[in-house]
């Protein structure tokens, strides 16, 4: 009986089960119940993996033991008793070991599908019985390494030969609240030259290109970032009569109007650019070149023009290794990336001003750069301070000599104002800028030549139609006159003249076709590259302007350190004086001072008491307070106490410590500025030298193309006229 009770509390072993079956042979009911229990236990042992997996997959196992964990714990503890009545002890041991191996294999297979290992499942179950909160400590999590590399990043590796092409430009209303409004989307094709089938297509708007270039100029202010075509195509020539001069030459000269005003305007523009230092006008804003301001171009031609220049922009960015290795540049070419989110993230990481960032890479800016002074905030004030004497002299000369206004404006005054307004160092930047060709003058000349070609093509079309109408009129007159007059010679002469007019009309028609083809070739092969050179020139001047601003920032930092040190010396001097006075007061010995204080206190205590009646002043004050209402005295004292320093010694010491810390930070900034300026000088000189070589090569190349196109056009015209001459001679 005791063995039966023990079996109810703890799981029985194989020997105990055999002994109990021998002792209780007469009790058949208890034997049948035990057999049913053993069958249930054997069924749970044969398929324990489902329950075990359910327990292992429970992510909240530390919250307590559930029914499944209780069943699995009992099943594993009662597992060896499954077949005790049918087999011997040795067979049961072998079968139990085999079953356990099978179960372990199932558990291993199931654990491979999980994010954490459950190999110590029995130990964790035993620990969970004591303290359920400790069960989660047995879980060993697997680390999932996502070594994912997109196709774009693979193609952008330095050793890969790739090329970018904008294949098409279509309209889209994706993301627009109003479906009727559409915008132009450009399809970018990233082509692997080694494997042409491995290409990637991406769709981007013009604003995406604009934001990309804007961020690149903020990250790399010293690198010449390739230009992009302007977005809006407007011709402001209608405003020239109202404004009086072009916005880029207005600060230098009144006589330098734009190129549309004939010969005098061209002379003024060239004079303004040649005399003095006309580089300041180029630094202010990038010039829109003549191709954009051509009014005869249609929207389709302008979109094709933009496709070509955006393709050049991306291919030129690929040639710059700093840009090619950027992660967000790969995101721009990745069709799966959301460019709006990427650009917002990058802009949040950049400083507000490029002068407060690392000139080598803005994304690697140290927080100490935020303590630098910003030279762009004090541009106008410093301009008037630095050029005060020059401005007064020039204004006096302008008022006294009205006839010499143009010479003074274009001469030395224009150069000084241009340099001072832009904060350009007269020695460094002008010596660098003299090696850069002024391509804006070439662009103005090209604009006038293209306008003349367009006018000539219109004249050719009118001449062709005129001569064709003459030939038709002459043919009608010959048919009417020959019926009345029988003159063979006159008829033949009229027919010859009719044919001559017809041939000359055909010549002008063919000349119209050839000159239009010339205009198209010059626009794509000469005006576009020339416009890029003009924009590159403004960009290189912008880089030179950045260098001059950094030099100005260095001088501002030196002045700030000088002022801080001066104020620190004054405060330290005041602190020494106060300490000396305090020490002198404390060092003096006053034996009579205590007696004097005691006598003074006694006199104050023995002072005569006031008369018992109410004082007259109280009644007067109460009456005055009843008549007039003044603000409370506590508010006034509080306001005064806020203005007046209550403890000047403590505040002075705090100022001294703050100034010392600030000076230490500024000295660190000074060391950083010295290193940055040396780096900036080297980079600017290197960029200007490389740009000078590139600029001369580009100009030489496009001039050769220009010469080739003109020679081909002239040969076609000669062939047309010689062909007509031979036909007329045969008559």
From Swiss-Prot:
A 1,2-diacyl-sn-glycero-3-phospho-(1D-myo-inositol-3-phosphate) binds at residues 205, 207, 231, 306. It comes from the Eukaryota. One of its GO terms (cellular component) is phagophore assembly site. Residues 608-617 have a biased composition (Pro residues). Transmembrane segments: none annotated. Residues 1-130, 253-277, 586-626 are annotated as: Disordered. Required for cytoplasm to vacuole transport (Cvt), pexophagy and mitophagy. Also involved in endoplasmic reticulum-specific autophagic process and is essential for the survival of cells subjected to severe ER stress. Functions in protein retrieval from the endocytic pathway. This is Autophagy-related protein 20. It comes from Candida albicans (strain SC5314 / ATCC MYA-2876) (Yeast).
């Amino acid at each position: 009986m005791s063995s039966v009770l023990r079996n109810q509390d703890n799981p029985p072993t194989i020997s105990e089960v055999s002994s109990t079956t021998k002792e209780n042979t007469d009790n058949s009911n208890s034997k049948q119940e035990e057999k049913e229990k053993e069958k249930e236990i054997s069924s749970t042992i044969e398929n324990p993996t489902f329950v075990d997996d359910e327990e292992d997959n429970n992510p909240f196992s530390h919250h307590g033991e559930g029914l499944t964990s209780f069943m699995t714990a009992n099943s594993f503890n009662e597992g060896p008793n499954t077949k005790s009545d049918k087999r011997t002890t040795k067979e049961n041991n072998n079968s139990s070991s085999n079953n356990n191996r099978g179960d372990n294999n199932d558990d291993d297979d199931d654990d491979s599908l999980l994010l954490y290992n459950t190999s110590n499942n029995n130990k964790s179950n035993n620990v969970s019985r004591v303290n359920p909160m400790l069960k989660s400590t047995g879980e060993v999590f697997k680390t999932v390494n996502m070594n994912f590399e997109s196709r774009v990043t693979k193609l952008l590796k330095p050793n890969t030969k790739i090329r970018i092409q904008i294949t098409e430009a279509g309209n889209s209303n994706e993301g627009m609240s109003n479906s009727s409004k559409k915008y132009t989307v450009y399809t970018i094709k990233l082509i692997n030259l080694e494997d042409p089938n491995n290409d990637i297509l991406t769709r981007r708007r013009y604003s995406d290109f604009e934001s990309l270039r804007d961020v690149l100029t903020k990250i790399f202010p010293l690198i010449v970032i390739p230009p992009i075509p302007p977005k809006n195509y407007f011709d402001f020539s209608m405003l020239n009569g109202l404004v009086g001069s072009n916005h880029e030459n207005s600060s230098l000269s009144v006589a330098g109007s734009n190129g549309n005003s004939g010969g005098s305007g061209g002379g003024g523009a060239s004079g303004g650019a040649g005399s003095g230092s006309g580089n300041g006008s180029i630094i202010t804003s990038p010039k829109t070149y003549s191709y954009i301001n051509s009014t005869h171009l249609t929207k389709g031609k302008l979109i094709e023009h933009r496709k070509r220049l955006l393709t050049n922009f991306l291919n030129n960015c690929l040639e710059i290794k700093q840009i090619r290795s950027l992660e967000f540049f790969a995101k721009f070419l990745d069709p799966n990336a959301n460019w709006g989110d990427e650009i917002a993230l990058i802009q949040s990481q950049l400083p507000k001003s490029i002068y407060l960032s690392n000139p080598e890479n803005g994304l690697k800016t140290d927080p100490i750069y935020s303590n630098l002074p910003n030279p762009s905030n004090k541009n106008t004030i410093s301009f008037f301070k630095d050029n005060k004497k020059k401005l007064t002299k020039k204004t006096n000369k302008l008022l006294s000599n009205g006839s010499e206004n143009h010479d003074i404006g274009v001469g030395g005054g224009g150069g000084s104002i241009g340099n001072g307004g832009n904060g350009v160092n007269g020695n460094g930047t002008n010596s660098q800028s003299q090696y850069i060709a002024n391509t804006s003058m070439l662009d103005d000349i090209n604009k006038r030549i293209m306008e003349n070609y367009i006018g000539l093509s219109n004249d050719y079309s009118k001449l062709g139609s005129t001569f064709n109408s003459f030939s038709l009129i002459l043919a009608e007159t010959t048919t009417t006159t020959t019926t009345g007059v029988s003159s063979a010679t006159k008829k033949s002469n009229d027919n010859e003249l009719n044919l001559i007019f017809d041939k000359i009309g055909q010549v002008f028609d063919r000349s119209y076709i050839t000159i239009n083809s010339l205009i198209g070739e010059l626009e794509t092969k000469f005006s576009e590259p020339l416009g890029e050179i003009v924009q590159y020139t403004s960009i290189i001047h912008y880089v030179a302007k950045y260098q001059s601003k950094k030099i100005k920032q260095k001088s501002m930092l030196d002045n700030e350190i000088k002022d801080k040190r001066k104020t620190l010396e004054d405060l330290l001097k005041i602190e020494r004086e106060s300490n000396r006075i305090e020490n002198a007061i404390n060092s003096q010995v006053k034996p009579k001072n205590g007696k004097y204080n005691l006598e003074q206190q006694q006199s104050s205590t023995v002072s005569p008491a006031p008369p018992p009646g109410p004082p007259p002043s109280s009644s007067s004050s109460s009456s005055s307070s009843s008549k007039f209402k003044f603000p409370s005295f506590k508010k006034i004292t509080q306001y005064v106490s806020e203005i007046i320093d209550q403890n000047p010694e403590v505040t002075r010491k705090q100022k001294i410590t703050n100034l010392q810390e600030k000076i230490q930070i500024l000295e660190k900034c000074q060391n950083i500025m010295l290193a940055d300026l040396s780096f900036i000088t080297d980079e600017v000189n290197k960029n200007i030298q490389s740009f000078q070589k590139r600029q001369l090569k580009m100009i030489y190349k496009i001039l050769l193309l220009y010469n080739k196109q003109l020679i081909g056009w002239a040969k076609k015209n000669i062939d047309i006229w010689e062909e007509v001459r031979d036909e007329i001679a045969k008559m």
